[in-house]
Amino acid sequence: MSHARLSVGSECWVSNNNGHWDAARLIEIKDNGGGKVVATVAKSSGVLETVNYQQLQNRNIGQSESPSDLTNLPYLNEPSVLHALHNRYNNKQIYTYSGIVLVSINPYQNLPEFYNDNLIKHFHKDPEAAKVPHLYSIASSCYHALTTDSKNQTIIVSGESGAGKTVAAKYIMRYLTSVQGVDHNGVVKRSVENQVLATNPIMEAFGNAKTIRNDNSSRFGKYVTISFDENLLITGANVNTYLLERSRVVSLLKGERNYHIFYQLITGCTEEQRDKWFLESASSFNYLSQGNCDEISGVDDSNDFTITCRALSTIGISESRQEDVFCLLAALLHLGNIEVCATRNEAQIQPGDGYLQKAALLLGVDSSTLAKWIVKRQLKTRSETIITSSTLEHAISIRDSVAKYLYSALFLWIVHMINASLDHNKVKRAAYKYIGVVDIYGFEHFEKNSMEQFCINYANEKLQQEFNKHVFKLEQEEYVKEGLDWRLIEYSDNQGCISLIEDKLGILSLLDEECRLPSGNHQSFLQKLNNQLPTKHSQFYKKSRFNDGSFMVKHYALDVSYQVHDFLAKNSDAIPDEFISLLQNSKNEFITYLLDFYMQLVSSQNKNPRKTAISRKPTLSSMFKSSLSQLMTTVSSTNVHYIRCIKPNEEKLPWTFSPPMVLSQLRACGVFETIRISSLGFPARFSYEEFAHRFRILLSSKEWEEDNKKLTLNIVNSVIPHDNLNFQVGRSKIFFRSNVIGNFEEAHRATCSKSTVLLQSAIRGFFTRKEYQRTVKFIIKLQSVIMGWLTRQRFEREKIERAAILIQAHWRSYIQRKRYLSLIKCAIVIQSIVRKNIAYSRYINELRESSATLLAKFWRAYNARKTFRGLKKSVIALQCVSRSVLTRRYLRRLQDSAGRTSILYEKQKNLQASITEVSKQLKSNSKKVTVLRNKLNILNNSLSKWKCLIKKPSDFSEPVSMDFTSNDEQLVQLLQAESKLRQASQQLYMAAKKSELGFVQSQTARENLSNYYQALQMTVSEKFEYDTEQLPSRVLFYAMDRYFSIHKKLKQLLELVGVENASLLPNEVVNKQTKDLLYEKRVVFLKQIKQALTVSSLFNAVGYKDGVMRLLETDQNSLLFAGVVNFLIFAGISLDLKTQISEFLSQLCSYFTKIVDGTVIENDKTLDFYEKPLQAVLYWFATLHKIRSFLVHLLSINSHGKQSVVEDLWNPLILKFSKHFSNLENSFHSLVQKLLSCCTEGSINALLNSKCLPEFIDAADENTTPTGMNIYELIDRMNLIHKLLISSALQPNLLELTISHMLQHIGQRAFQTLIHGRSPYTWKSASQVSYNASLLINWCHQKGISYVNSSLLPLMQSPLVFCLRKNDANDLDVILSVCNLLSPFEVVCLLNRYQPCAGENPLPKSFSKAVEALSCKYKQSGFTNGKITNTNGHAIPIAASKNPLLSLENNHIYEELRLSELINLLAKATL
């Protein structure tokens, strides 16, 4: 890169003493003659320096000094490239193009904003985004080339250790997998990124180590291919590895560590594994302690070991196989600790070496044989086999070779398992095209370079050769496309260096030949190199001038000197056949499998189409050459993209740029070589529009053309006229050779400088005129200010003189006045002191007297308050006692009134009976009077007829008068009887009125008394009903006792039916006849039990249909059905019918689930509507509880039994279904509570709104008609519910739990409504609530039910808040102390609901203020009422019954199941 012409004033770069470059400006050029030209330059620091003119390099200035593509630099030279990268790095631009190569400088900082999903979409969808240097631009170009050209693609990522190669490869794979979602609507076949990156912990553990330069350095290269199908969907991936650094297993430099897996194993294994593998600390092992670095800051090896184990499981390596891997690693560590000592010229191992025994045990070989082949070697001749002793150095080499051999085989096997987990074979069949990512080491050169650096640089030579071809191919294709006058040129190639390495008589061939010789050594190998290579490859091979055992190879990037000391050992890296035979016969199955795998893999990689007579072992160089050849074949068949990763500083500091280090890497990785190759052509190119826009200022505006191409040619001709060799015109672009564009930049700078000078002169004249005018104005203004200031000064002097005279006069008078006042003040002070003392003594006396008086007053007030509080408490207690006495007296009066009312009631009955009798007589007499009246009418009619017929009445006067007289007497008698009847009826009516009035009075008294008396009547009647209702259940529980007594015998008898070792039972369990009979019918009974173990047949036997059983009327059915089910379960377990029992219990759970789901609860229905569903649900609830109790009983039997096999067989099954039945039991309990809640709907109204005490009814409520259910109806409904619960044969604990939960629900809802409702309460209405709650508590006493936790006691105590006195704050304290079951917050809520009765005074203000203060106190403290909770929806733990239930009496169920014969037989046997 020669510099262009430099003139005085040009910017340039000058080399300093450190071999770096400083920015400078050319001041003077001087020709000293003899072709020696010197120049004087001024550095940026201002120092002048004289240097050789030829050493100066052109410097780019302005916008062109840090372009996005280094080939666009006007001057292409090392300092310009380095400065451009430095500027971009400081501006947080870590990516820069260098032709087709992307240079990436590691920022040593996480930059998520550089790689987010939006950026992926931007690079994928916008073609112009590829012009921006970025990892995604390379990946985008690669992906689009695959989609358009259908050609395989490869991205080569290279660089030093710690330069960011792995991270770059990771983000490239992330891009390639993420764009699948963009192209295919988010449907990605597999996340290859996650699968490949999931293997990173494994590859890092087994292939990474801490070096001097990097804490996590990859000591191998890899090539990851991502395969696509015809639809460009990702189908899989594959990982190929190259050149694992095997020597690191046995040797380390200071400050380095071995592979991470060894340290992870030591710190992360369990104590059991540590003892099993004889592991100690890392410092105790020879292979780990050489570097004196056991830990890395910020790295937790124990946690990494857990991650590694999890990753091994992910790729399909089982835990047992992982144990084998770790055992092998431990064996390698013990192998390195085997101490080989020298006796004269022979190596020897002590037989009692502990590490020898441990290594042999872990490897599965004989310790003596292992020690033998370490210190001995076997030589085969044609006639015999000779065993000779090895030297100390050779024995140690053999020991280390075995360790390296086994570790290399283990590493290749792990890579094979990773590829198997990625399903590579199937990928090859389904793949259409692929994109490969090569993460390979960059060019390496250290103070001492060995076999590893030689192979790495050999690989980089091959890649550089491919890169040279690729660059020239692309460049020349663009020249042809643009139609340039271009002849294809020859370009420099590094084939000579490659031939030096890989020819027949090259370095690798001579190395393999020396390794095959029995007496080969590194001195003879170096001699062969020096004898044969300098003549043929003198340009690339150079002998060492010193006899230091090294040779030099001139690589494309740098001349590297290699030490040949370890070349032969590292190249052969094989173990003797005796060791291979020893390990193949190992007792460790994994060792033999690993050796077979490794040998097959090596033989497959080294297949030679030409068959040779002698079978040769493959060497490291031959295997690496073969794999590198395959890689280059693969890469050459694809379209290649290059990324060079640069390490900016050695300390790994973020955003810190070290120019010397970056410069050495740029030279080593071939970036400058890339620029040199590009400069042979036309590296600088511009579109016509871009060139015209930038350089149009070189022409006057009159010469500007609308056609950009013409304008571009005019500009070019104005700068470099008649110079067609340095540029060419294409179809859409103009091309320039290297450094030509600098002339345009120089002309551009000169034009801008000339224009700037002209512009500056005009601007400076303008500003000078402005400054002059501003100065004149300022001078005029300053003069006026000064004149005014002088005038004011003269006036001030005159004013000061006058003021001085006045001040003197005042001062003299002030002095005299002050002297007089001081005398007066002294007199006053003396007087004040005297008076003060007198007043102070008087004050002290008065203070003592007032204090004594005040203390006496306070003491008397305290005694008075104390006495008053005592009296007040006594009065309150007395009031409570007197009120209770009065209440009891009132109760007795009501009882007496009720007695008198009963007497009146009996009298009323007698009067009603007499009234009824008299009414009957009255009706009969009325009928008689009617008959007589009819007869009278008939007689009157006949008389009138006779009067008309008799002409002479005197003839008939005597007989007629006699008849009339007789008839008239009868009529009079009838009328008299009728009047008597009417009088008697009137008397009876009046008596009935009086009796009715007395009955009304008695009824009123009865109603007053019924509030207290009815509870006693209910208690007596319900006690009788309870005693009678308990009779069937008592009979049932007596039957259960009988079942429990025969339980043990039944178990033994069933074991005789199904258990083969029945002879082991005691003889006294059952007699021989029963035993023989049961054993003979074993097969029949076994078949019957299997048929009975189906839920469908069982439910058909009991008449189950749609959740209802045909014998549901009695509670014996619950015991009967549960006993049959338990018997079948017990029989199935005894007969070892595990499958049938599992299906039977599963179907039983399904039936119970259907019953729960099929029960529909409807609101707003009567109690009769819920009676049958509640009875059915209670039946199934009791049945389910008995079945679950039996399963729990079986678990307790098995847990204390002696047959562990039976326990292990049945306990998991029983425990599983016991949990299922427990969940179903909770579901049934919740269903029962919902039904009970519907049955007790209206209970809140009954507790809070029932007005059962007429004396305590408010005036506002006298005319209101009560609505809803009252307290007596609620108690009747509770009685009916209690009957249903008793009839369901529930266990006592279930019965108490169910009723307690129902009372809890009623009490909580009523208490919440009382506190948070809207209706106000007086002391009378509160007394009604207290009475209603007492009736409900009394009902609990009658039934023997606990109500302590049912919220009834707080409800009972709440009315006291309304009834106690409320005059002042002390009364509030009394209320809080009396209502101890209520929190202060609840008391405040109740007091807010209080309303005085009609005619009562409102609450005093003092009491209201005390309530408000209490309320504010709890609001400020954030108090919330924690007492009122709702237990609905919580699963209540239900304890199983202690006694199981089995049904052994024959019934219709057993008859339906055809088990009657077995039941009868068992019943007889248990008698």
Swiss-Prot record:
Residues 628-650 are annotated as: Actin-binding. InterPro entries: Dilute_dom (IPR002710), IQ_motif_EF-hand-BS (IPR000048), Kinesin_motor_dom_sf (IPR036961), Myosin_head_motor_dom-like (IPR001609), Myosin_N (IPR004009), MYSc_Myo5 (IPR036103), P-loop_NTPase (IPR027417). Keywords: Actin-binding, ATP-binding, Calmodulin-binding, Coiled coil, Cytoplasm, Motor protein, Myosin, Nucleotide-binding, Repeat. Pfam families: DIL, IQ, Myosin_head. Involved in cytokinesis. Residues 1171-1417 form the Dilute domain. One of its GO terms (biological process) is actin filament organization. It comes from Schizosaccharomyces pombe (strain 972 / ATCC 24843). Residues 753-773, 776-796, 801-821, 824-844, 849-869, 872-892 form the IQ domain. ATP binds at residues 159-166. Residues 909-952 form a coiled coil. PANTHER family: DILUTE CLASS UNCONVENTIONAL MYOSIN, ISOFORM C (PTHR13140:SF706), MYOSIN (PTHR13140). One of its GO terms (molecular function) is ATP binding. Residues 65-749 form the Myosin motor domain. Residues 7-61 form the Myosin N-terminal SH3-like domain. Gene3D superfamilies: 1.10.10.820, 1.20.5.190, 1.20.58.530, 6.20.240.20, Kinesin motor domain, Myosin VI head, motor domain, U50 subdomain. The gene is myo51. The keyword Thylakoid does not apply. This is Myosin-51. Belongs to the TRAFAC class myosin-kinesin ATPase superfamily. Myosin family. GO terms for cellular component: actin cytoskeleton; cell division site; cytoplasm; cytosol; formin-nucleated actin cable; mating projection actin fusion focus; medial cortex; membrane. It is found in: Cytoplasm.
